[in-house]
Amino acid sequence: MSLNDYVKAQKLGEKRYQAALSKNEYPYLPVLDELITNSDIAGEVNLGLQHISLDRVVGTATKGRTTAFASNFMPILDANSEFGNKWSSLCDSHIEEGIHDPIKVYEYMNKFYVIEGNKRVSVLKYFGADSVPAMVIRKLPKRTDEPENKIYYEFVDFHKQTGINYIWFTQLAGYDKLREYIGCLLYTSPSPR
């Protein structure tokens, strides 16, 4: 069993936990249920199976598991706990055959919050994986005049048209320019003979 890996991951978690406390920051995973309310949401869209960047997986959907992880998704519970044993077993499975089962997440403002699969995310982040398969439910915020909200809705349109979900702009019109560029490439590339 990968108890050694758990202990290493736990040390990374403890380091992040202590660093957050020293800066007066919340030391655990952000909880989507605590960040938004139903009145903040215009609707939900089931996006189905997607590959998502682990860098964009930032928290958990509900408070239930949040104190098992530091804010970097590394475990902080005792290695000899049931949680530690399950994490270690999942680590063994990942080493032997990989993690194939998709996690389930909410996407909100192009960040992902785990509904099911926190330990899978933790193990994959520990091993430095780039992405994870996920069943994604998008929570659409109500439209506002805030620049971040406008950029997000540009992203939603871009994602709907291209399927690309791993590019994030911080200024308005970035997605329009990229869409024009992609369209230009599609229409100017030489046709096969």
PLM ranges: what are they?
Residues 108-111, 115-178:
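Glycine- and acidic-residue-rich phosphate-binding/metal-coordinating active-site segment common to enzymes
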Residues 187-192:
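Conserved small/polar residues in nucleotide/adenosyl-binding loops
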